[in-house]
């Protein structure tokens, strides 16, 4: 076996079939010895690290992001290796503000790893700043099999003339409250539809009622069919996050042919270029102006240049990962 690929979900394993077609033998679940252990997400770092120690093989980590509110100015807990297992001694003070054990173990593994890869320039810089590790930028992908293009999913008749869609976890940094405040500013407020699950759901419902904004928020993860239907019916997709390591939702929206308005943060600029409208992530008046501009345009779907999405497909991601994987396996590039 070439690679033992550690992934917490289907998304983080998207490039595996293409890499197998390229000749790599990859296992998603196995204790058999492999030439390389690869953690495709922070949730798998400890398991991949300990596997690499047991089987004495190289280790590669994919670090998606390092949220500033979780690490802040704090210091990592002390992490030790005992018999190939990571053990942690918590600091009594000045530690990382949130999930100290998780990020302390990740830092230790990154400093021991043979390679650390990140999806964006922003994350590369954060890894060097917080972990003291030189990482390589290797962008991941959106699910180009699931969102193959607008021509595969023709637009449905909208249930109301103006509808605004947002798709993500319902947590504070995703910034959905800004959407509601912006919608309340419009002379003809749209239906706001938010698909996702998380602790902010009830707060958003209360805010929408206070602002008299029509909100459709099921509060549970939607099926693929429901998400495709929501994209087809929406007038615009809004991605208001204050922080991202990569940013999947706007890529999905562009692939589905939707107008997209995104927060002006570095990863959005890095991958979306001039294909979307931007707004300051704490300025609801700015977002309201961008919404008015989109709603004033004809309803036809915008054309997205293939040059923007093609480098971020599953196959393109596999092509980027392959040289690094083969190098760590000791093969000629």
Task: Label the predicted regions.
Residues 10, 299-330:
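A charged, aromatic-enriched C-terminal amphipathic alpha-helix characteristic of glycosyltransferases
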Residues 83-116:
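Membrane-proximal helix-turn-helix segments that form the acceptor-binding/catalytic region
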Residues 110, 229-234:
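Short alpha-helical donor nucleotide-sugar binding micro-motif in glycosyltransferases
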Residues 169-185, 199-202:
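A conserved mid-protein helix/loop that constitutes part of the nucleotide-sugar donor-binding site
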Residues 205-225:
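Nucleotide-activated donor-binding/catalytic signature segment of Leloir-type glycosyltransferases, i.e.
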Residues 242:
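Aromatic "clamp/platform" in nucleotide-sugar-dependent glycosyltransferases that forms part
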Residues 259-262:
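Short hydrophobic beta-strand element within catalytic cores of glycosyltransferases
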Residues 276-285, 292-299:
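Conserved acidic donor-binding segment of nucleotide-sugar-dependent glycosyltransferases
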């Amino acid at each position: 076996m070439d690679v033992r690929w550690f992934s917490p979900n289907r998304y983080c394993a998207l490039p595996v079939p293409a890499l197998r077609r390229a000749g790599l033998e990859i296992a998603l679940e196995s204790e058999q010895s492999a030439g390389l252990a690869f953690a495709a997400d922070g949730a798998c770092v400890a398991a991949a690290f300990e596997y690499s120690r047991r089987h004495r093989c190289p280790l590669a980590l994919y670090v998606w992001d390092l949220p500033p509110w979780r690490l802040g100015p704090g210091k990592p807990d002390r992490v030790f290796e005992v018999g190939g297992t990571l053990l942690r001694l918590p600091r009594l003070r000045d530690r990382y503000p949130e999930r100290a054990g998780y990020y302390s173990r990740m830092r230790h593994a990154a400093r021991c790893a043979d390679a650390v890869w990140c999806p964006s320039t922003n994350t590369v810089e954060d890894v060097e700043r917080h972990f003291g590790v030189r990482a390589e930028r290797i962008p991941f992908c959106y699910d180009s099999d699931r969102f193959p293009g607008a021509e595969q999913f023709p637009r449905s008749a909208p249930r109301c003339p103006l509808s605004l869609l947002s798709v993500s976890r319902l947590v504070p940094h995703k910034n959905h409250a800004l959407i509601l405040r912006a919608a309340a500013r419009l002379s003809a407020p749209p239906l706001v539809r938010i698909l996702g699950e998380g602790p902010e759901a009830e707060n958003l419902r209360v805010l929408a009622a206070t602002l008299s904004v029509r909100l459709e928020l099921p509060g549970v993860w939607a099926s693929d069919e429901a998400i495709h239907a929501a994209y087809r019916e929406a007038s615009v997709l809004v991605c208001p996050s204050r922080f991202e390591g990569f940013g999947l939702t706007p890529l999905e929206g562009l692939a589905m042919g939707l107008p997209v308005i995104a927060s002006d943060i570095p990863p959005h600029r890095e991958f979306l270029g001039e294909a979307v409208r931007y707004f300051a992530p704490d300025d609801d008046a700015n977002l309201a102006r961008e919404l008015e501009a989109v709603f004033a345009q004809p309803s036809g779907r915008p054309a997205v240049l293939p040059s923007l999405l093609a480098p971020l497909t599953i196959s393109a991601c596999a092509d980027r990962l392959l040289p690094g994987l083969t190098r760590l396996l000791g093969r000629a590039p």
